[in-house]
């Protein structure tokens, strides 16, 4: 089920305040956040946001094509190590 249009997108207040301060000051800093559920809004374009993946913060540069997506979509939480090999040695 999608979010109601009357509510608008969810963006964590602390994240939005930090982006507004950076836009007003004009500085280029990496914004660190744990809020993977926040929606990317046009105000964030051009900033680098470090998104937590459960172990570390991954720096992600926000572009205009990312608007409307969630921050967590760009920081994968699982590492794929490959499928099991299909030979005689690995079966033992």
Swiss-Prot record:
Its biological purpose:
Protein S19 forms a complex with S13 that binds strongly to the 16S ribosomal RNA.
Q: What keyword terms does UniProt attach to this protein?
A: Plastid, Ribonucleoprotein, Ribosomal protein, RNA-binding, rRNA-binding
Q: What is its main location?
A: plastid
Q: Where in the cell is it found?
A: Plastid
The name under which this protein is listed is Small ribosomal subunit protein uS19c
As for family, the record states: Belongs to the universal ribosomal protein uS19 family.
Signal peptide location:
none
Q: Which residues form a coiled coil?
A: none
GO cellular component assignments: mitochondrial small ribosomal subunit; plastid
Question: What is one GO biological process annotated to this record?
Answer: translation
Kindly list the GO molecular function terms attached to this UniProt entry.
rRNA binding; structural constituent of ribosome
- List the InterPro entries hit by this protein, alphabetically: Ribosomal_uS19, Ribosomal_uS19_bac-type, Ribosomal_uS19_CS, Ribosomal_uS19_SF
Q: SUPFAM superfamilies given for it?
A: Ribosomal protein S19 (SSF54570)
């Amino acid at each position: 089920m999608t979010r109601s249009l009357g509510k608008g997108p969810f963006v964590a207040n602390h994240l939005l305040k930090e982006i507004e301060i950076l836009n007003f000051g004009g500085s280029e800093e990496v914004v660190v956040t744990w809020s993977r559920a926040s929606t990317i809004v046009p105000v964030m374009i051009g900033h680098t946001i470090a998104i937590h993946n459960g172990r570390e913060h991954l720096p992600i540069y926000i572009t205009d094509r990312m608007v409307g997506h969630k921050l967590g979509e760009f920081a994968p939480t699982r590492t794929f190590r490959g499928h099991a090999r299909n030979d005689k040695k690995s079966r033992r």
